[in-house]
């Protein structure tokens, strides 16, 4: 079994790392370059950098900050937020990113994943999916075939502001077919709540795709990370709050996972 990865996440807006609850109530967590260097030193397997307001603000990529972060880390760096085109992938790779993450742009134009993967390889194309469990009212609404949609999760775009009506599990499968090398799966219901991953969502997507799935949204303790792997079927686990505010270190997270029989790089 391959080692499971622990990935701290930097949600960035206005040049600062922030953390919210359910994608709202953002709280400052510090300077992205300093925080990235800290996680690099703690032994994180990878780092994810998400410009969380680039798409909703219609802004360009913040290349100077990305270059500064890339200069401080010697582990794979994934950058997302405002990635719209194959040309954006080139610009980010040149700025020091190892992988690029598409979200809203893939929803607007799914073919961009085919094109980016064909040009740069699936290994550097991540598709981020922000998913929210359907309300009973949403589940009762008819789907494309006229039957009630039923329980499940919908995909949201524009930083979690817009329900696309896409089914999260089906969307993940389509993105993998089109050439995504990895799925970054965030539960909006659990984001920042510290109540653990949405394991049913994680498992449903993990079972539907053959590419690695990164579980995100809801980590409150070290056992939540292990549960994401053992119960959710995730290949990697992403967390922010528990690391940013000093509750736990990456090393402690790896020790707990190893103690539960999960292979990690110590």
Curated annotation (Swiss-Prot):
GO annotations of cellular component type: cytoplasm
Compartment(s): Cytoplasm
Region described as Disordered: spans on this chain: 134-157
Keyword Cytoplasm: yes
Pfam families noted in UniProt: His_biosynth
Keyword set, alphabetical order: Amino-acid biosynthesis, Cytoplasm, Histidine biosynthesis, Lyase
Top EC group: lyase
Subunit structure and binding partners: Heterodimer of HisH and HisF.
Function: IGPS catalyzes the conversion of PRFAR and glutamine to IGP, AICAR and glutamate. The HisF subunit catalyzes the cyclization activity that produces IGP and AICAR from PRFAR using the ammonia provided by the HisH subunit.
Family statement: Belongs to the HisA/HisF family.
Protein name: Imidazole glycerol phosphate synthase subunit HisF
This protein's encoding gene: hisF
């Amino acid at each position: 079994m391959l080692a499971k990865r622990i990935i701290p996440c930097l949600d960035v807006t206005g040049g600062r790392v922030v953390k919210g609850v359910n994608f709202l109530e953002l709280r400052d967590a510090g300077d992205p370059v300093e925080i990235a260097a800290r996680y690099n030193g703690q032994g994180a397997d990878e780092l994810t950098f998400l410009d969380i307001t680039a798409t909703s603000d219609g802004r360009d990529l913040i290349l100077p900050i990305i270059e500064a972060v890339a200069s401080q880390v010697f582990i794979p760096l994934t950058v997302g937020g405002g990635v719209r085109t194959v040309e954006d992938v080139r610009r980010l790779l040149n700025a020091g990113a190892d992988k690029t993450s598409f979200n809203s742009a893939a929803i607007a134009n799914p073919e961009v994943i085919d094109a980016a993967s064909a040009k740069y390889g699936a290994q550097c194309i991540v598709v981020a999916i922000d998913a929210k469990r359907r309300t009973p009212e949403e589940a009762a609404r008819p789907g494309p075939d006229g039957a009630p949609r039923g329980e499940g999760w919908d995909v949201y775009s524009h930083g979690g502001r817009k329900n696309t009506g896409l089914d999260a599990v089906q969307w993940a499968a389509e993105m993998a077919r089109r050439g995504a090398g990895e799925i970054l799966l965030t539960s909006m219901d659990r984001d920042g709540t510290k109540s653990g991953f949405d394991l049913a969502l994680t498992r449903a997507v993990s079972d539907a795709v053959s590419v690695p799935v990164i579980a995100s949204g809801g980590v409150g303790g070290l056992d939540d990370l292990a549960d994401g792997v053992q119960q959710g079927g995730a290949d990697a686990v992403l967390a922010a709050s528990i690391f940013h505010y000093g509750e736990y270190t990456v090393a402690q997270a790896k020790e707990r996972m190893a103690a539960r029989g999960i292979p990690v790089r110590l």
